[in-house]
A protein has these predicted regions:
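Beta1/beta-strand and adjacent pyrophosphate-binding region of the FAD-binding site
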Residues: 7-19
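Membrane-embedded transmembrane-helix bundle of lipid-linked glycan/lipid transferases
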Residues: 14-16, 25, 30
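N-terminal Rossmann-fold NAD(P) dinucleotide-binding loop
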Residues: 22
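Conserved N-terminal/central alpha/beta ligand/cofactor-binding core
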Residues: 28, 34-35, 40-132, 185, ...
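Flavin (FAD/FMN)-binding glycine-rich loop and adjacent Rossmann-like elements that form
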Residues: 48-50, 110, 150-157, 162-417
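Conserved beta-strand-loop-beta-strand element in the redox core of flavoprotein oxidoreductases
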Residues: 134-152
């Protein structure tokens, strides 16, 4: 049976994935003068920050100084101005790094993203996924599946902001997946109880008789009750595939239901309810591209200054394992950087990467996967794709000084040191 292409779109830059990185890649490309189309699998923009409920991006400041700016910060500021967040106190050295993350109202932030895409002139198509790609010397033909059928996009450049490097993998470029991926988390909120309503000892005694996974302890259960959410690590492998993602979502709900029913059996917790769950489980790690440059943990934590740095990144190495978190912090006044080469799949002419799957080792990736950094890499990829499209230049041949000029024009920080 012949499959007919229903719609044929053209663009200078096609961005696949309208999540944490992709939405700012599209806005930045459009603001740099490119005709831009943005394809998003969900019904809303924002990805992990909205659909997965991780609505507390960070870190935009390091050692008391703003290190990430531009359209992504404007989106945060507009959300604050609309009453959708309260700006935390910024200090030289906060007691806890997450105190400087900004808790955003998901509804207001999503509306701001839609508005900013409209203002920039981005052509947005939601509820669609990439299904194929063909690359020539001069352009790309990308197939997407819309609700009404298959459509094509002819674009000069493309940005993979899927979080899983799906487009890059389809195009035949090398991606890397660790033997084990970091666990995922389904965001949620529980209510209907107080800490004085139950006996901790009863929880410990009953827990010992239950058949819970070995990575879940009675102390974990008590911690969930203190923070008001079932903050569980869910084993995650192959989240870059439909089958793997399906298995992950099922396991998230099964695990959460088991804990929920256990808690409901405890005297004093009969009225406990899960009153919010995110629309999808938040994935920390899947694929990473093999890039023109690869960020190592040593380079990242020591603030190595690349000759093609495009943004700062300030978050501790934050490797989640099933039974906890392994962290390592920057020394005082040290800030990590992201090189442009880490956004370029090795030997790519027309495709860039933005977000958590940029080229990095597993430990560096555990830090640069966080949301403010993903936003900043999106901005860098958007400007680079727009400039490369305008000058008919391979992405790897783009002049670094021109990229810095474009980033400065959109308000991004470029004074790297």
């Amino acid at each position: 049976m012949e499959i007919k292409v229903k719609n044929q779109y053209t663009a200078d830059v096609a961005v696949i994935g309208g999540g944490t990185a992709g939405v700012f890649a599209a806005i930045s490309a459009a603001n740099t003068g490119a005709k831009t189309i943005l394809i998003e699998k969900n019904s809303i923009l924002g990805g992990t920050m909205t659909a997965a409920g991780v609505n507390f991006p960070g870190l935009f400041f390091a050692w008391g100084k703003k290190i990430i700016d531009g359209p992504c910060w404007k989106a945060v500021q507009r959300t604050i101005d609309l009453g959708g967040a309260v700006m935390p106190k910024i200090s030289f050295k906060p007691e806890r790094h997450w105190d400087e993350q900004i808790n955003l109202n998901k509804f207001i932030y999503t509306a701001v993203l839609f508005k900013m895409c409209d203002e920039a002139g981005v052509q947005l198509i939601c509820n669609s996924m990439v299904s194929g790609i063909t690359e020539t010397d001069k352009d790309l033909k990308i197939l997407i599946t819309e609700k009404t059928g298959m459509s094509s996009i002819t674009a000069k450049k493309a940005i993979d902001a899927t979080g899983d490097a799906n487009l890059i993998q389809m195009a035949g470029y090398e991606v890397i997946k660790g033997k084990k991926q970091q666990p995922a988390t389904l965001q949620n909120h529980i209510s209907g109880y107080s800490m004085n309503d139950f006996s901790e000892n009863e929880i410990r005694l009953k827990f010992a008789k239950e058949n819970f996974p070995e990575y879940l302890t009675a102390d974990n259960i008590l911690h969930f009750l203190r923070i008001g959410k079932l903050d569980m690590h869910i084993p995650c492998s192959n989240a870059d595939t439909s089958q793997g993602k399906t298995a992950l979502e099922k396991q998230s709900y099964f695990n959460m239901l088991k804990v929920y029913m256990f808690l409901k059996s405890i005297k004093g917790l009969e009225n406990l309810e899960i009153d919010y769950t995110a629309a999808e489980t938040g994935v920390r790690e899947s694929n990473r591209i093999a890039g023109e440059k690869t960020i190592t943990a040593e380079e990242y934590i020591n603030g190595f200054l690349y000759d093609d740095s495009v943004c700062y990144a300030f978050y501790p190495i934050d490797l989640h394992v099933m039974d906890g978190i392994k962290q390592k912090y920057h020394s005082e006044n040290v800030v990590g950087k992201i090189p442009y080469g880490a956004l370029i799949p090795k030997n790519s002419k027309h495709i860039l990467c933005a977000g958590r799957c940029i080229s990095s080792d597993i430990y560096a990736n555990s830090a640069i996967r966080v949301e403010a950094v993903c936003m900043a890499t999106g901005q860098a990829a958007g400007c680079a794709a727009a400039l490369s499209a305008h000058t008919n230049t391979d992405v790897v041949a783009l002049k670094y000084n021109k990229l810095c000029e474009a980033l400065k024009k959109i308000g991004a920080v470029t004074d790297f040191e």
